[in-house]
Amino acid sequence: MKKILLTNDDGYHAKGIKALEQALEEMAEIYVVAPKHEKSACSQCITITAPLRAEKIKGKEGRHYRIDDGTPSDCVYLAINELFKHVCFDLVISGINLGSNMGEDTIYSGTVAGAIEGTIQGVPSIAISQILSNKNKNTPLSFDLAQKIIQDLVQNIFTNGYPLKGRKLLNVNVPNCSLQEYKGERITPKGYRLYKKEVHKRTDPKNESYFWLGLHPLEWQKRENEDRLSDFDAIASNHVSITPLNLDLTSYDDLKSLESWHEGMLK
């Protein structure tokens, strides 16, 4: 039977990861290793300066752990290299995140980081996120569509193989709409996010300053000279966006111009 490792950044008890397990439990043998507490926006943080404690969850056949103060990257690393080191995972899936992971969100996202860690460890990986609100602001949150999408994706992967080669992963965002309003899926590039940048300064009882960072999404910016619609465009029209992400951050288009610039600097 196929084996899938689940993680998230909303925490072990989050509704999204429970919905994810429920969607897949008849398709594969499910293992869950997730942070004990919420770790949203922790990015690719991995713990190397403090110990990690893994708590085995009773009644889950030894397949569920929550990691005290662990990040999604910690969870996936620990699961593959120690907790279930004798298990050959077919997929790592991170989610279902409560909120979008599009554009620059992917850099901050702990959800995407969990899938990235799976990719680093050599396992095909998917990050999946549920949009909390869009133009249908009165639509109650439901994971029905996200569950259907992940079931379809996983079945396709099990039947036809993982679609990406090398150190790449799938990033999936699901619109906040009903199954009846859903328009289909689009393969999209990552768009550009515009944020409202806020810093909230406060004073504690000892008259010392502390800060809350606010990084609230405002809108997105259209991609220039791009025929293909972005992940934001897909979500805005009630489509699921599926975006391939590459771990190689090298800007190959700039290598030659950078060489010329560097040669000029040496003259």
Swiss-Prot record:
A Pfam family of this chain: SurE
* Gene3D superfamilies for this protein: Survival protein SurE-like phosphatase/nucleotidase
InterPro entries in alphabetical order: SurE, SurE-like_Pase/nucleotidase, SurE-like_sf
Write one Gene Ontology MF term.
metal ion binding
Q: Which GO terms describe its cellular component?
A: cytoplasm
Note accompanying the cofactor annotation: Binds 1 divalent metal cation per subunit.
List required co-factors.
a divalent metal cation
Quote the EC number: 3.1.3.5
> Which residues bind a divalent metal cation per the record?
D9, D10, S40, N97
Listed A to Z, the keywords are:
Cytoplasm, Hydrolase, Metal-binding, Nucleotide-binding
Q: Give the protein family.
A: Belongs to the SurE nucleotidase family.
Briefly, what is this protein's role? Nucleotidase that shows phosphatase activity on nucleoside 5'-monophosphates.
Q: What is this protein called?
A: 5'-nucleotidase SurE
Q: Which organism is it from?
A: Helicobacter pylori (strain P12)
